[in-house]
């Protein structure tokens, strides 16, 4: 496991000696010599003058190094003085740059961390306890929308906000099924499955892929045809960073109505919250597939009393009167009225889901703001529920949450299109579940003791939920990265270590992912603390 709080420079020095056998042990490589070797290699591969390369390759002595590093760190837990830092950051501006970064990192025997938007909850895209470089994809942000073909090519460094904005520029009746956080990077989001508030209608992001481009371990730039269907399948939900560097995806755009409806309804423990959450389990995953009913559950203090607030946040691909009539029959506990609803365009609903004030009036270009160098402290975990939690289970859950005080839950319903896709169509295996749970705790204080307290809250609630969630294995969602469920040191037991978390993320699809990994990257160059191992590492 990454030990960001205890990492010390002595260990980093030792890792340099061990990991770079081509340098004399009597004269360990300096950061300058590593940088010079990389720049020379990069120049040779890209046919670029070394003077031009300095704008895209940053050593630790570069005045811009710290700002480039911090820009896409989205979790303050991994932005401390003791957090391991890369020897070099590469910010490619072309596919050739990416290819060169791969081959040069490999030749220098440095681990390559691939960062798109920086939203990896455990920071695995930009930290390591081994000597490493960062490949920061943020400059590769092209989004080319073809409305006639109802498709778009999206570069890995683009954000979801940029994707939605570029679609909106071309059409008010097209969208793409992906997440609600506009600063999330496309590369990690889609390669890990990708979901949003249209998943019950259109499935996951990876259910809407046409093509992809990737740089493989040999620096080759491959599309779907040249990489083959096995590798294309693997990077369609199995996590791209285990197999290469995803350059981009060609996706199918989906039709959305001119007018959609959003609403938010909240209740507290003394006003029907338990009944609402209990009933939600039988409605959310089974209702009209045009309706997505997210459930937020949060401990709060109200009128000086600790309680729990349950909030339904919804998107309906249709008019307000339709959804009010529908839920009047299916979910009377919600007490939904038309005045609770707001009608708007699909793009405006994306702004609303991002908690923007007056989404029908705001400048759409706010989705082009990447909010750089801004990070709270946080921890996320995930679970899947296959059968409804009984009412007394909901009551006991609320009691436990009030005791803990901070940790919240998000229930995301499945059903609809999700239940129609076979379990092995993509690496994402959780199709038949009723809903997914996200455990979420966020704080602002930079304190080791405060962090320990909140991490403990997450672990206590996760343990409490054991009897209500999936078993053998206890499933998890790759894009809600959680190192508590297992990590890989990539030593002699790499396969066995990888199987622990791999089965939780991918179920039986883990076996095929291992085979693809072994064929595509037999020496395991592309690796992180939760990557897919090779079959060659099986004891």
UniProtKB/Swiss-Prot annotation:
Gene Ontology MF terms: FAD binding; oxidoreductase activity, acting on the CH-OH group of donors, oxygen as acceptor
Enzyme class: oxidoreductase
Pfam families hit by this protein: BBE, FAD_binding_4
Domain FAD-binding PCMH-type: 82-256
Primary subcellular site in the record, as a coarse category: secreted
Endpoints of the signal sequence: 1-26
Gene3D superfamilies: 3.30.465.10, 3.40.462.20, Uridine Diphospho-n-acetylenolpyruvylglucosamine Reductase, domain 2
Cofactor-binding details, from the entry: Binds 1 FAD per subunit in a bicovalent manner.
Subcellular location: Secreted, Cell wall
SUPFAM superfamilies referenced in this protein's UniProt entry, alphabetically: FAD-binding/transporter-associated domain-like (SSF56176)
UniProt keyword annotations, A-Z: Cell wall, Disulfide bond, FAD, Flavoprotein, Glycoprotein, Nucleotide-binding, Oxidoreductase, Secreted, Signal
Disulfide bonds: 41-104
EC number: 1.1.1.-
Positions annotated as glycosylated: 79, 340
Cross-link position per record: 6-(S-cysteinyl)-8alpha-(pros-histidyl)-FAD (His-Cys): 119-181
Mod. after translation: The FAD cofactor is bound via a bicovalent 6-S-cysteinyl, 8alpha-N1-histidyl FAD linkage.
Family matches, as InterPro entries: BBE, FAD-bd_PCMH, FAD-bd_PCMH-like_sf, FAD-bd_PCMH_sub1, FAD-bd_PCMH_sub2, Oxid_FAD_bind_N
Cofactor: FAD
Cellular component GO terms held in the UniProt record: apoplast; cytosol; plant-type cell wall; plasma membrane
Family, per entry: Belongs to the oxygen-dependent FAD-linked oxidoreductase family.
Name recorded for this polypeptide: Berberine bridge enzyme-like 21
Organism name: Arabidopsis thaliana (Mouse-ear cress)
């Amino acid at each position: 496991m990454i030990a960001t709080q205890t990492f010390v420079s002595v260990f980093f020095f030792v890792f340099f000696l061990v990991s770079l056998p081509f340098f004399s042990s009597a004269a360990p490589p300096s950061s300058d010599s590593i940088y010079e070797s990389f720049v020379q290699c990069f120049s040779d591969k890209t046919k670029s003058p070394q003077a031009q390369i300095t704008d895209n390759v940053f050593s630790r002595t570069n005045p811009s190094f710290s700002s480039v590093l911090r820009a896409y760190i989205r979790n303050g837990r991994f932005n401390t003085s003791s957090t391991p830092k890369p020897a070099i950051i590469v910010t490619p501006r072309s596919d050739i740059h990416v290819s060169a970064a791969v081959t040069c990192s490999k030749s220098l025997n440095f681990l390559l961390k691939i960062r798109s938007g920086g939203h990896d909850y455990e920071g695995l895209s930009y930290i390591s306890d081994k000597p490493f470089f960062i490949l920061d994809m943020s400059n590769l942000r092209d989004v080319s929308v073809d409305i006639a073909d109802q498709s778009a090519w999206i570069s890995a460094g683009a954000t979801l906000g940029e994707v939605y904005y570029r679609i909106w520029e071309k059409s008010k009746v097209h969208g793409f099924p992906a997440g609600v956080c506009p600063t999330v990077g496309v590369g990690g989001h889609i390669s890990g499955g990708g979901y949003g508030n249209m998943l019950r209608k259109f499935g996951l992001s990876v259910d809407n892929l046409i093509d992809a481009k990737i740089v493989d371990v040999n620096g080759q730039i491959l599309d779907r045809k040249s990489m083959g269907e096995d590798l294309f399948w693997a990077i369609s939900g199995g996590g791209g960073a285990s197999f290469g560097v995803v350059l981009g995806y060609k996706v199918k755009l989906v039709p959305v109505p001119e007018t959609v409806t959003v609403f938010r309804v909240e209740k507290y423990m003394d006003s029907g919250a338990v009944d609402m959450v209990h009933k939600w389990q039988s409605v959310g995953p089974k209702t009209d597939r045009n309706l997505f009913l997210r459930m937020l559950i949060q401990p709060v203090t109200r009128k000086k009393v600790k309680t729990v607030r349950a909030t339904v946040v919804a998107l309906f691909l249709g008019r307000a009167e339709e959804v009010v009539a529908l839920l009047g029959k299916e979910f009377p506990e919600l007490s939904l009225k038309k005045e609770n609803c707001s009608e708007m365009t699909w793009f405006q609903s994306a702004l609303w889901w991002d908690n923007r004030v007056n989404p029908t009036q705001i400048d759409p270009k706010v989705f082009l703001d990447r909010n750089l160098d801004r990070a709270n402290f946080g921890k996320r975990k995930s679970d899947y529920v296959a059968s409804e939690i009984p009412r007394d289970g909901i009551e006991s859950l609320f009691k436990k949450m009030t005791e803990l005080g901070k940790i919240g839950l998000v229930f995301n319903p499945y059903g609809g299109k999700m239940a129609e896709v076979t379990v092995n169509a993509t690496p994402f295996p959780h199709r038949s579940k009723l809903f997914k749970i996200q455990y979420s705790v966020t704080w602002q204080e930079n304190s080791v003791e405060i962090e320990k307290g909140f991490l403990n809250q997450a672990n206590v609630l996760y343990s409490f939920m054991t009897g209500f969630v999936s078993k053998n294995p206890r499933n998890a969602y790759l894009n809600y990265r959680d190192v508590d469920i297992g990590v890989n040191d990539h030593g002699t037991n790499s396969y066995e270590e990888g199987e622990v978390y791999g089965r939780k993320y991918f179920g039986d699809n883990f076996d095929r992912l291992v085979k693809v990994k072994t064929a595509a990257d037999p020496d395991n160059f592309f690796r992180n603390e939760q990557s897919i191992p090779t079959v060659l590492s099986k004891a």
